[in-house]
């Protein structure tokens, strides 16, 4: 009989759950609604994917991440999970085929855009097949207090109520204040939910703020980017014009950069996003239209060229750095002009003809101004930046974290810069499978010998070849941490390979022999 732990190992290759995950899985399996607030990189998806494979019917994952659904589902399929997606990127024939297969019982997990819930074909499906669980990803989108309010999310409650039998409902988000959590509870009609908020602290992230006039920002940006070498990073700008100008600036210096914003056509956005995920470009310059749901683990820095509209947006965007747990830098460049730009957008949204009542729009504008106030406080505070963020999200914090620009004395900051430069020089992101990175996780298992590094190079190259054949990002095959563990432990059989963290049965069957050959050849030629 399958258990949560056996599913975790079989499909995802992990021996144990991260903090908070197992309790959520057990509550969902017991039929209790869940409201989980877990920071980026904490493993939210495991919390609903594992029970989805144990529950009898279909699990629906309602997500706004249309541009990423294909990759999200692709990663599940690579792990051996029967999954599909439904959104407006599919042709009519593709939608019809997907719905037919779903009615035939092909899928355990279906990702769906909220706008598709009312589609007649989808309505027929959910009336005919058992829906065991409805998962609401990025649940903060349901709240006007949230930074990504989407009116389409308000339809989810009625959709759940229309099902023949009420499924268990799980709501997941990376950032949610008390106001947002209240809205999620109310608008999804959660029934006595199990609520969990894991720590927002990301100890591996270094936070810094820099005041810079608009005329000074290009130089500040180039200084920051050039110090990063070949490391992957994201630069956020507040306007599409700023994105295009900044991308051209970086490209003019020979830096592989791409742009992403809503005014680009869908094909260009998709290509640029894929180029970043597949390591064909180093830096993505983007508006806040980019990043939600991006699961690229080796982003080493996030730079905000302009101040974001609120701390929820900032922390979620900055949190896209260092998802692999290794050191990463989050830098905010701000000026008074940024505040004026944000206020312009708030007023523009209030005056927009979007079908919402005037009083609702006025209240949304008031809440936006309140959030902007705290964002401005963060940008200018002389106190601990990490402490400011944690307290904003309702978490106790020490007076000093020792890992932000405000906590460090001038001499300490200079020393950190030197240490950071040395670390990054030794830990430069692998480009085209050239050089493996040393990291804290590597050091914890012992420094790699020269032989191990050569083997790791070969494993990276093999992963790149296999990812190219499968047309998936390299990290979907195996993570950097998994390959490092292979290089250290040198498994010589499938059974030994299954003892490596991140290697599940399905991936071992699909890729195991290809990596074992590399290890065997290296050991024999030693």
Explain the meaning of each model-derived region.
Residues 1-4, 340-341, 346-361, 367-373, ...:
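Accessory DNA-binding and partner-docking regions appended to nucleic-acid-acting proteins
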Residues 27, 304, 378, 485-486:
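Short alpha-helical segment immediately N-terminal to, or the first helix within
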């Amino acid at each position: 009989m399958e258990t949560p732990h056996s599913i975790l190992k079989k499909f995802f290759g992990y021996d144990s759950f991260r903090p908070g995950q197992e309790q959520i899985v057990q509550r969902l399996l017991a039929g209790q609604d869940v409201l989980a607030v877990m920071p980026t990189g904490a493993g939210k998806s495991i919390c609903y994917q594992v029970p989805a494979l144990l529950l009898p019917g279909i699990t629906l994952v309602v997500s706004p991440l249309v541009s990423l659904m294909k990759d999200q589902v692709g990663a599940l399929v690579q792990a051996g999970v029967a999954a599909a997606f439904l959104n407006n990127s599919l042709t009519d024939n593709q939608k019809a085929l997907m719905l037919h297969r779903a009615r035939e019982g092909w899928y355990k997990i279906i990702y769906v855009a909220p706008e598709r819930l009312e589609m007649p074909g989808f309505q027929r499906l959910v009336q005919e097949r058992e829906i065991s669980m409805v998962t609401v990803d990025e649940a903060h989108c349901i709240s006007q207090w949230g930074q990504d309010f989407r009116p389409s999310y308000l339809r989810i409650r009625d959709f759940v109520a229309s099902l023949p039998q009420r499924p268990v409902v799980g709501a997941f988000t990376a950032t949610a204040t008390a106001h947002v959590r209240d809205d999620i509870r109310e608008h999804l009609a959660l029934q006595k939910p199990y609520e969990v908020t894991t720590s927002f602290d990301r100890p591996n992230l270094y936070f810094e703020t820099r005041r810079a006039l608009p005329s000074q920002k290009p130089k500040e940006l180039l200084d920051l980017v050039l110090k990063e070498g070949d490391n992957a990073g994201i630069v956020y700008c507040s306007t599409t014009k700023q994105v295009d100008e900044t991308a051209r600036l970086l490209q003019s210096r020979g830096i592989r950069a791409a742009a992403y914003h809503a005014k680009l056509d869908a094909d260009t956005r998709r290509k640029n996003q894929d180029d970043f995920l597949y390591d064909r470009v180093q830096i993505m310059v983007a508006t806040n239209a980019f990043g939600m749901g991006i699961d690229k683990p080796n982003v080493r820095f996030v730079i905000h060229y302009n101040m974001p509209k609120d701390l929820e947006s900032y922390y979620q965007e900055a949190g896209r750095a260092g998802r692999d747990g290794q050191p990463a830098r989050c830098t905010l460049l701000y000026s008074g002009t940024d505040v004026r730009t944000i206020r312009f957008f708030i007023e523009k949204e209030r005056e927009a003809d979007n079908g919402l009542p005037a009083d609702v729009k006025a209240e949304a504008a008031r809440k936006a101004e309140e959030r902007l106030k705290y964002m401005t406080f963060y940008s200018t505070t002389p106190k601990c930046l990490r402490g400011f963020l944690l307290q904003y999200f309702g978490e106790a914090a020490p007076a000093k974290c020792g890992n932000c620009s405000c906590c460090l004395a001038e001499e300490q900051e200079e020393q950190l810069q030197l240490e950071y430069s040395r670390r990054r020089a030794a830990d430069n992101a692998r480009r085209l499978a050239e050089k493996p990175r040393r990291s804290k996780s590597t050091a914890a298992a012992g420094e790699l010998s020269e032989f191990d590094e050569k083997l790791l190079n070969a494993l990276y190259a093999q992963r790149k070849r296999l990812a190219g054949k499968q047309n998936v990002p390299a990290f979907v095959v195996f993570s950097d941490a998994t390959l490092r563990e292979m290089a250290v432990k040198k498994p010589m059989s499938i059974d030994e390979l299954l003892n490596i963290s991140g290697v599940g049965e399905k991936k071992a069957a699909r890729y195991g022999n290809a990596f074992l050959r590399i290890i065997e050849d290296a050991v024999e030629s030693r």
